[in-house]
Amino acid sequence: MKASMFLALAGLVLLFVVGYASESEEKEFPRELLSKIFAVDDFTGEERGCKGFGDSCTPGKNECCPNYACSSKHKWCKVYLGK
């Protein structure tokens, strides 16, 4: 009983997808869908002038961004709490 319900539901979903794809074929739906799925953001690799939370740092060099401080124990930038 459960298997037949699952197959019926899967068939309806497949029918819906095929119908939608055939209607959208004029708009190049498959190509557009694949390009959106496999799109890679353009990462320029710009470096910041400071290091953010969790970035490795050297204590005493003031490499971390404002509101962060280099932990002398762990050697990474942490949130500076003003102590």
Swiss-Prot record:
The modification Leucine amide is found at residue 81. It comes from the Eukaryota. Residues 1-21 form the signal peptide. Expressed by the venom gland. Keywords: Amidation, Disulfide bond, Ion channel impairing toxin, Knottin, Neurotoxin, Presynaptic neurotoxin, Secreted, Signal, Toxin, Voltage-gated sodium channel impairing toxin. GO terms for molecular function: ion channel inhibitor activity; sodium channel regulator activity; toxin activity. Its main location: secreted. It is found in: Secreted. GO terms for cellular component: extracellular region; host cell presynaptic membrane. InterPro entries: Huwentoxin-1 (IPR011696), Huwentoxin_CS1 (IPR013140). Residues 22-48 form a propeptide. Selective antagonist of neuronal tetrodotoxin (TTX)-sensitive voltage-gated sodium channels (IC(50)=1270 nM on Nav1.1/SCN1A, 270 nM on Nav1.2/SCN2A, 491 nM on Nav1.3/SCN3A and 232 nM on Nav1.7/SCN9A). This toxin suppress Nav1.7 current amplitude without significantly altering the activation, inactivation, and repriming kinetics. Short extreme depolarizations partially activate the toxin-bound channel, indicating voltage-dependent inhibition of this toxin. This toxin increases the deactivation of the Nav1.7 current after extreme depolarizations. Negative results: has no activity on Nav1.4, Nav1.5, Nav1.8 and Nav1.9 sodium and calcium currents. This is Hainantoxin-III 8. The lineage of its organism: Eukaryota, Metazoa, Ecdysozoa, Arthropoda, Chelicerata.
